[in-house]
Amino acid sequence: MKRYATGLAVMLAMALATTPALAKGVFDGTWKGDVKASQPAEKPSIILLQAGTFSCTTCKPALKFPADGAFHPIVGNPYYDEASVAVVDATTVKRAFRKSGKTVAEATVTLAADGQSSSSAFVDRTAPSGVEVTGTTVNARVAPAPAGAHALSGAWRETTDTQVSDTGLVFTFAQDGKTMAFSTPTGISYAATIDGPPATVTGDPGWTKVALKQTRPTTLFETDYEGDTPIGTYSMSLSPDSTTMTTAVNDLKHGKTSTMVAHRQ
């Protein structure tokens, strides 16, 4: 399940054809994630910008490089292989990411006047299709910046004030028997057999396989993989009126849990 650029998950739900209601394709169609109705992860991200060095201990892989505005090599991230951080002033920092020499993501992070929240206006082009996801991530401070560090240092937790473009929230799926097809505006897609073996995911370098397991007539359990390594699980349930999907997300890669909501369009 593709995560949009903020780290929150965009939901999908799948159905098993052996159940009469599901055989009618009640999940078929277009859905859209609702950030306001969702519950972001409680576990914060930890950033330190001090003595000319940027570090992120909660990033995967952990990051540490000079905050000099130049690009520095990053090993182990499927979405980018270079990153840069530039300090604009006492309350603003710019970040950028490249892959194979091409800029794939940019963000301008700004501290609020009270120092207790920050906003990150971002453009994400990490999908191989090049389709952009844009928006503004809004974070609340959980722990203060250490003495002598830039004011944007500290521990931060995402809030429901975050805004994301439809390209990062919308998804479509269609059921044919026990096969569920999934697609997004950014070009991510798969066709997976429910209760079958892992299927190939295309269009996302960090999400390469998916496995679906039916747990109840209107609930499906999904496991996502990067290669052969599980990176997340999603327990997706349909509301009684079939207009809302609620997903319990377990981000195994980052050790975070959250609850995501999507509505039928």
Question: Where are these predicted regions, by residue range?
Answer:
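Bacterial N-terminal signal peptides that target proteins for export
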Residues: 1-8
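Bacterial N-terminal signal peptides
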Residues: 9-17
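Hydrophobic small-molecule pocket/channel-lining residues, especially in calycin-type beta-barrels
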Residues: 23-265
